[in-house]
Amino acid sequence: MSASYVSDLHINVKGVPFHLCKEMLAKRSSKVSSLLERNEIDELRLILRDLEVDPETFELVARFCNGSEFKFTSDTIVSVLCIAYYLGMNEEQSSNNLLGKASEFLEHRVFPSWSETINALRSGDKSFDKLADVGLVDVFFDSLIEKASYDPRLLGELIKNRAETDDYRPNPRRRLFVIDWKSEDLITIPLRLYEPFMIRAIKSRSIPVEYIVLSVCKYAKKWVFDTEESLSGQKREAIEVVERLLPYQRGLISCELLFESLKHSIWLEASSECQNGFMIRICKQLDMAKSTDLKILSRGYGEKAEGFENIELVKTVVKSFYTYYANEDSETVSHFVKVAKLSEEFLFLAASEASLKLEAFVELAEMTVAVSQGILSYSDGIYRAIDVFLESHRYLTESEKMEVCKVLECGKLSQEGFERAAKNQKLPLRIVVNVLCVSQLQIRDTVAKEIKGMEEKVDEEEEEEIEVSSDEDEMEKMSNKLLGLEIENDECVVHRRKNMKKKKKKISVWGQVKRKFGCLNSSSSSYSVDACTCDVKKKKKKIHHHYE
């Protein structure tokens, strides 16, 4: 080396001074060696200015250069790799150099473990930009994807159905890593690494989509819902990433999380694409929601926020649902029924809230009436909500009570609803009278329908009797004719038998006489038969003439 080398090099790392031997450092680092050859001492002192290096990590590098004992950890390995790569501490400069040793530790001690890999990825976040050329980030991602493909539970535990067993059977492949049951959670890595990792995992198609969704939902809860309000900028970025990563498939995401996400996206003033994305997902499965999910939208923002402050957002969601399912079919009709019942349940839930204003209740009630029109047969749900609202707002005047009750369609109450409303002392007197009148009209209509039905039934029975009697007359006539024919037939048979006996008797006597005379032959026999036949025919004619 040049004689101009100064033995000591003073470097400050975040206020911590380090005294290094230039010759020892130049032996391991090609970059330091090059600067010393050009005698650029000032540049050498600022050699680490472009790196995000902490004193603990640089101390490992210094100990390695001095030949002292050192120890890698998953917390420091990425930063050490970054320094070694930046300073050119490779095998070309010196055998058994720092870059090779750090790479070996990464391969054999970090990558086999899910938790160690997550820890290294999280700790070395700021150093990855300097390692973009070598593709180290992709190596980390592929390692994690392989582990998650083998056992998706590393991303979190799904809520199991009763039919499912507790045993999970991983993919039948050779395992080249260890499974950490108390593992580090993927959602702890920085957002700028989490999003590209999840995109890469989705494209790989090797991890079940349910586990992808589970991880993204956990990320939203940690970095959007549960963080401090002062970090609104970071939360806005996080909610937009969450929206981009979530699928649109119906039923994969819980309604609770979708409602929370929509509310926060509006509060954080996220992009319109983000807000619309959550709205579309909600519309796809609003029929699967609960009344408590709708309450999330109506609740204000902040820790002291009360429920039912934002009724307009609830109305917007319900309206968007019907716009989304504009083309009716057999499947969407069932969705409409469920959403109509959901609106009634939400109205009932809101009615018990003492802080709910009259105007807000009326708006919700009108919305419920609109979505129930032509869908639900009875308005008992709206009546129950009105009853609860009047109970929790006993200070209302008679005119205000009338304002509340104007949405009630008395004609759509069930019989049980009529009975309850007629005895309800909280209702305005005019409403009770209206209920009684409608009830009487319905009873009258019911009785009239019953009478009409009975008359129609009697008429039908009389027509049936007439038809039966006419049929009986026809049957009697037919029976008489058949009886007459049977009598005629019997008489014919009797007469024929008598005539045959007489003829046979005559033929036999005459035949004997002829035989005695010896004049019986075939011709005479034939004649006798013909004569007999003629005689029978004549008698038959006489018989027919007799019946005629």
Curated annotation (Swiss-Prot):
The keyword Phosphoprotein applies. Keywords: Coiled coil, Phosphoprotein, Ubl conjugation pathway. InterPro entries: BTB/POZ_dom, NPH3/RPT2-like, NPH3_dom, SKP1/BTB/POZ_sf. SMART domains: BTB. Residues 180-442 form the NPH3 domain. Pfam families: BTB, NPH3. Residues 7-74 form the BTB domain. Pathway: Protein modification; protein ubiquitination. Belongs to the NPH3 family. This is BTB/POZ domain-containing protein At5g17580. The lineage of its organism: Eukaryota, Viridiplantae, Streptophyta, Embryophyta, Tracheophyta.
